[in-house]
Regions:
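A short SAM/SAH-binding and catalytic strip from SAM-dependent methyltransferases
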Residues: 113-127
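Short alpha-helix
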Residues: 173-190
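A short glycine-rich, Lys/Arg-flanked "PGG" loop and its adjoining helix->strand segment in the class I
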Residues: 128-142
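Core SAM-dependent methyltransferase catalytic element
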Residues: 189, 198-217
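Class I SAM-dependent methyltransferase SAM/SAH-binding core
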Residues: 52-54, 58-103
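Conserved class I S-adenosyl-L-methionine
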Residues: 1-47, 60, 144-173
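A short acidic, Gly/Pro-enriched loop at the edge of an enzyme's catalytic core
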Residues: 105-114
Length: 217
């Protein structure tokens, strides 16, 4: 059974999250993992001229790329988040407030790279998202994404309540798979190449980071 997303409720959840993280937005940064200074960098995107970040959050990565001459576009479903990042980075980056599937269906623009850092790839049904990403990429363009690896034995859509487990029920879904399953999903969706791996944390026994890269055309 597929997860039953309620985008209105999820928008409220992400607005609550945005309120907590936009009080003080940090400096531009390029970091694929949850550990500062750990892991690969901008080279995963292979020198794009144009990028789209899906689930762009605070926009810090887009600002980093824009400072290096990349035409940067971001989409996020939270109006609170988008208002804050437009105020912070709007002179450098184009931000759109939209649900990612609707945005990709409605916008015909193509990009050299699409990426997600703990963003929409983690929170959106890949059967619906990945074919749309393929269409949004120029031939030879790449999708790069990162998020925590699946908990062993817990695969597919995983429900997640907003913190506290009390009050009005607000929840969303994360999509968790093994690297091999991600590669299969990517190839079945129309990518010509796919490589997904788990990068170990800098400290033994800590949570690693799943990093995927796929090429269109």
């Amino acid at each position: 059974m597929r997860a039953r997303h309620n985008h209105d409720d999820e928008r409220d959840l992400w607005d609550t999250y945005a309120t907590s993280v936009t009080r003080e937005i940090g400096n531009p940064v390029m970091n694929w993992t949850q550990y500062a200074g750990h892991g690969p960098g901008v080279e995963l995107l292979e020198s794009p001229s144009t990028v789209l970040e899906i689930g762009c959050g605070t926009g810090r990565t887009l600002a980093y790329l824009a400072e290096r001459g990349v035409r940067a576009t971001g989409v996020d479903m939270s109006p609170v988040m988008v208002e804050a990042v437009r105020e912070r980075w709007g002179d450098q980056v184009s931000f759109h407030c939209a649900e990612v599937l609707a945005f990709l269906r409605d916008h015909g623009e193509q990009y050299d790279a699409v990426y997600s850092i703990f963003g929409a790839v983690w929170f959106t049904d890949p059967a619906k998202l990945l074919p749309l990403v393929v269409k949004a990429l120029r031939p030879g363009g790449s999708l790069v994404f990162s998020h925590p690896p699946a908990i062993p034995g817990a695969y597919g859509p995983q429900g997640m309540y907003k913190g506290g487990f009390a009050g009005r029920a607000q929840f969303t879904y994360r999509y968790s798979y093994t690297p091999g399953k991600w590669e299969s999903l990517l190839l079945r969706s129309g990518f010509s190449k796919a490589e997904v791996r788990i990068l170990d944390a800098p400290e033994s026994g800590h949570i690693g980071t799943l990093i995927g890269r796929a090429v269109a055309g």
